[in-house]
Curated annotation (Swiss-Prot):
Localization per record: Plastid, Chloroplast stroma, Chloroplast nucleoid
Taxonomic source organism: Arabidopsis thaliana
Protein name: Heat shock protein 21, chloroplastic
Low complexity bias locations: 14-34, 56-65
Keywords: Chaperone, Chloroplast, Plastid, Stress response, Transcription, Transcription regulation, Transit peptide
């Protein structure tokens, strides 16, 4: 579409010569058309809506026979940070929230190219943390690479499990010295049916294992006499 601008032309006035009188009836109207330009913001928005992600699958040796699949953009829900839920800025999480997060994470996990023990060439992504609720206990796993048991502190405050980790590194040479400190922490609301004074923790090869035993529920049976 084009927009039209209409106006009437009149004679120019010169300071050296007297201007002739021109009546408004003798003015000749004409029109000028300008092409309408599409705003760049609309075009950019259209490109973003039609953008796609390209995922490469089935890569073989020597980069032979690779296929690509077009997928719409979607937000990844899996946390891939080294400590998983150990985020100092995250709010306190409950056990049920962790279990729900694990369910969503495993539903969204995709097989990736690699080697596994079976030799099939496809392996699953390892989550940086895991939690399992069994019949008599709750088991947790947190990946803490580079930390020793002296760097990790676990405590129970009221009904909240507190996990803190801190790692200090000092780098020095002939001309420069520096120190880096990394701290992590999380607070987990424990369920009511657990024995807080019998929680066990073990750190092996940068992996923290926590076992929380559940309280034994004794079922009381009462016989009702029939009259």
């Amino acid at each position: 579409m084009a927009s039209t601008l209409s106006f009437a032309a009149s004679a120019l006035c010169s300071p050296l010569a007297p201007s002739p009188s021109v009546s408004s009836k003798s003015a000749t109207p004409f029109s000028v058309s300008f092409p309408r330009k599409i705003p760049s913001r609309i075009r950019a928005q259209d490109q973003r809506e039609n953008s796609i992600d390209v995922v490469q699958q089935g890569q073989q040796k020597g980069n032979q026979g690779s296929s690509v699949e077009k997928r719409p953009q979607q937000r990844l829900t899996m946390d891939v940070s080294p400590f998983g839920l150990l985020d100092p800025l995250s709010p306190m999480r409950t056990m049920r929230q962790m279990l729900d997060t694990m369910d969503r994470m495993f539903e969204d996990t995709m097989p990736v190219s690699g080697r596994n023990r079976g030799g099939s060439g496809v392996s699953e992504i390892r989550a940086p943390w895991d939690i399992k609720e069994e019949e008599h206990e709750i088991k947790m796993r947190f990946d803490m690479p580079g930390l020793s048991k002296e760097d990790v502190k676990i405590s129970v405050e009221d009904n909240v499990l507190v996990i803190k980790g801190e790692q200090k590194k000092e780098d020095s040479d002939d001309s420069w010295s520096g120190r880096s400190v990394s701290s992590y922490g999380t607070r987990l609301q424990l369920p009511d049916n657990c024995e807080k004074d019998k929680i066990k923790a073990e750190l092996k090869n940068g992996v923290l294992f926590i076992t929380i035993p559940k309280t034994k529920v004794e079922r009381k049976v009462i016989d009702v006499q029939i009259q």
